[in-house]
A protein has these predicted regions:
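Fungal extracellular Ser/Thr-rich, low-complexity intrinsically disordered regions
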Residues: 1-41, 298
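Internal transmembrane alpha-helix with an interfacial aromatic "cap," most often the third helix
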Residues: 61-65, 115-174
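Membrane-helix boundary/juxtamembrane motif in polytopic membrane proteins
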Residues: 181-184, 202-226, 246-250
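C-terminal transmembrane-bundle signature of multipass membrane proteins
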Residues: 219-304
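Helix-loop junctions on the outward
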Residues: 90-125
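First transmembrane helix
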Residues: 44-69, 88-91, 95
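Juxtamembrane membrane-interface segments at transmembrane-helix boundaries in membrane proteins
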Residues: 30-44, 112-128, 247, 252
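Alpha-helical transmembrane segments in multipass membrane proteins, preferentially the mid-helix core
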Residues: 60-62, 168-172, 190-211, 226, ...
Length: 304
C-alpha cells in the first residue's frame, strides 16, 4: 500500500543530487615476503662465452705477433698477450659458473598513507671480474707508460690509484647501506688521479716526440681513459643502485673489456710495429739475461 502523496514525492526527489564518497580506496601495500632474485639469464651467459672465445683468439694472435719480432721489441706484445690471457681465464670461469656469489640487500620503500615496507634483494655478483681488472689494468697502464715514456714516479702513482679504484669498487658492491657511496667517491677520486697521471703527465712526456708517435700515444691513451670512464658509470647503475639487470650489466662489462683488453691491444701492436720512429727497444736483462762477465767471486782461494 502506497501512502497518499508519496508517489508524487518520489517523482520529484528522484532527480535530486546525491552525495558521493570523497575518499578513494586506500591502496594496499604488501611487504615483500620473498626476496627478489636478480641473476644472469641466457643473454648474459652467451655473452660470457663469446668474450671468452674472443679473448682466447686474441691471445693466440698476440703471441703469434710477439714471435715474429725480435726479443728487444717484444715487451709490448708480451704484456698485451698476458692481458688477454688473464681475461680469457676470468671469462671462462664466469661462463662455467665459477667466481660468483650473491649480494643480499634490503631496500626501504616509504609510503605516505600506509606503513613503510622493505624488500629484500639477492643479486648475482661475479667477483672474479674484479680479480681480472686488478691484474690486467696495471699491465694496460704499463703499456701506456712505455708507449709515452712516462717516468716511474708517475706510473707508480697511476697503478696505485688503479688498484685502489677497483678495490673500492668491490667494497662498495658488497656494502649494504649508504656507506657504499663513500667508497664510490673513492672510486671517482682514483679515476681522476689515473686520468691526471696518464693524460696530463703522459702528454707532457711525448711533447717532443715525432708527430706519428705523439699521435699514437695521444689517441691510444685518450681512448683507454674514455672507456675506463664506463667503470664508475656501470658500477653505479648496476650493483650499487640496481637500476639495470644482471644481463645488461654483463653486456656492458663485456663491451668495456673487449675494447680495453682486446681491440685496443691490436691497435697498440699494429700501430707500434708500423711506426718508423718511436719503437720501444728494451735490451739488457729483458733480452740478454744476467751477465756474469767480469764477476769477482769472494772467498775462493787459488789452487782450491
Amino acid at each position: 500500500m502506497i501512502v497518499p502523496g508519496m508517489e508524487e514525492i518520489l517523482k520529484h526527489t528522484a532527480t535530486l543530487p546525491t552525495s558521493t564518497p570523497t575518499v578513494g580506496p586506500i591502496p594496499t601495500v604488501t611487504p615483500g615476503d620473498w626476496p627478489v632474485v636478480q641473476h644472469i639469464h641466457d643473454t648474459g651467459k652467451r655473452t660470457l662465452w663469446v668474450v671468452a672465445v674472443l679473448m682466447a683468439i686474441s691471445s693466440i694472435a698476440f703471441y703469434s705477433l710477439a714471435a715474429r719480432v725480435r726479443v728487444q721489441t717484444r715487451l709490448l706484445h708480451t704484456l698485451t698477450a698476458l692481458i688477454t690471457t688473464v681475461s680469457f681465464l676470468s671469462y671462462l670461469a664466469m661462463a662455467t659458473g665459477e667466481g660468483v656469489t650473491y649480494k643480499h640487500s634490503v631496500v626501504h620503500h616509504p609510503h605516505k598513507h600506509v606503513p613503510d615496507t622493505h624488500q629484500e634483494y639477492l643479486r648475482e655478483i661475479f667477483w672474479v671480474r674484479y680479480l681480472n681488472w686488478i691484474i690486467t689494468t696495471p699491465l694496460i697502464l704499463i703499456n701506456i707508460a712505455l708507449l709515452g715514456g712516462l717516468n716511474g714516479a708517475n706510473l707508480l702513482v697511476a697503478i696505485a690509484a688503479d688498484l685502489i679504484m677497483f678495490a673500492a669498487g668491490l667494497t662498495a658492491t658488497f656494502t649494504h647501506d649508504e656507506r657504499r657511496w663513500v667508497w664510490y667517491t673513492i672510486v671517482i677520486i682514483s679515476f681522476l688521479t689515473i686520468g691526471f697521471q696518464v693524460g696530463i703527465n703522459g702528454a707532457r712526456s711525448v711533447r717532443r716526440d715525432a708527430d706519428q708517435h705523439r699521435t699514437l700515444f695521444t689517441s691510444f691513451a685518450g681512448a683507454n681513459l674514455l672507456v675506463f670512464l664506463l667503470y664508475p658509470i656501470i658500477l653505479a647503475a648496476s650493483p650499487l643502485s640496481q637500476r639495470i639487470s644482471v644481463d645488461a650489466e654483463t653486456v656492458a662489462w663485456a663491451i668495456h673489456d673487449i675494447l680495453t683488453q682486446g681491440l685496443f691491444g691490436y691497435w697498440l701492436l699494429l700501430g707500434h710495429d708500423s711506426s718508423e720512429t718511436g719503437q720501444l727497444y728494451v735490451d739488457g736483462f729483458w733480452s740478454q739475461g744476467i751477465s756474469h762477465e767480469g764477476a769477482i767471486r769472494v772467498g775462493e782461494t787459488d789452487g782450491a
